[in-house]
Amino acid sequence: MGKKKMKLSSLFKGGAGGLLAVPLCYNAKTLSFRVGDDMIKTVNSVFFDHHHNNNNGGDLLEAETPESWFTNSSETASHSTESDQDLDAESLEMVVRGVVRSERLFFDPGVTSSILEEIEEKSKSDLKSKETVAVGEDRSTPIEEISVAVAMESEDPYGDFRRSMEEMVTSHGELAKDWESLESMLAWYLRMNGRKSHGVIVSAFVDLLSGLSDSGAGITSASVSDSARYSTAVSSLPSSPVYSLSQGQTEIQEEERRSC
């Protein structure tokens, strides 16, 4: 007896020996189809490729979906990009204007290429200027800054002026060593007092110099002789207040003698 062979017919073969024809869905109106179509178009920036659908021979029809389901992301992106570009341009223009107005682009080149050397030179120049000012103040200190003018009635003008000058020299030792300072002191006494007192002031000043020379306070005999010649020359001038004062004192003394 012959054996019978069992054969299974393929599920994918039709009656004519071809592939099993699966019917296509031409009406994609169910929710599952809409969601799938929606996801694909969202990834593709919501771009409907009608040319691609036409090339497919109409096998797949485009689903009828309302426009409210999608947003035109390309237009929104373009609007946001344009607004961002406008803001960036305005911000850049404001920054450039601020830099130009604040003069940050202008600089003053230094003398040296090293910052430390420039700082050291500047500090040295500042120190020299301070030292110069300090020395100048010590050398030419006005008599007004170290004295106070006091108006008083005196029965002994010569003695008062002499004591006042001695106090000035004692309290300020540099006066006894600097002839220019002594001259400025004499000029101050003459300027602060009337012409009638100039002769007494000069006499007190000359005696002061003599006392300083004898005590060895720093005034040389040449300075004393210079001051004596100065006072003599001043008093001998007819137009000087000292000369008129001496003449007035002489006349007063003569009148007193006559009255006696």
Curated annotation (Swiss-Prot):
Expressed in roots, rosette and cauline leaves, shoots, stems, flower buds and siliques. The keyword Transmembrane helix does not apply. Residues 150-211 form the OVATE domain. Pfam families: Ovate. Keywords: Nucleus, Repressor, Transcription, Transcription regulation. GO terms for biological process: negative regulation of DNA-templated transcription. It comes from the Eukaryota. Disulfide bonds: none annotated. The keyword Transcription applies. It is found in: Nucleus. GO terms for cellular component: nucleus. Transcriptional repressor that regulates multiple aspects of plant growth and development through the regulation of BEL1-LIKE (BLH) and KNOX TALE (KNAT) homeodomain transcription factors. Plants over-expressing OFP13 show small rosette size, late flowering, reduced fertilization and blunt-end siliques. This is Transcription repressor OFP13. The lineage of its organism: Eukaryota, Viridiplantae, Streptophyta, Embryophyta, Tracheophyta.
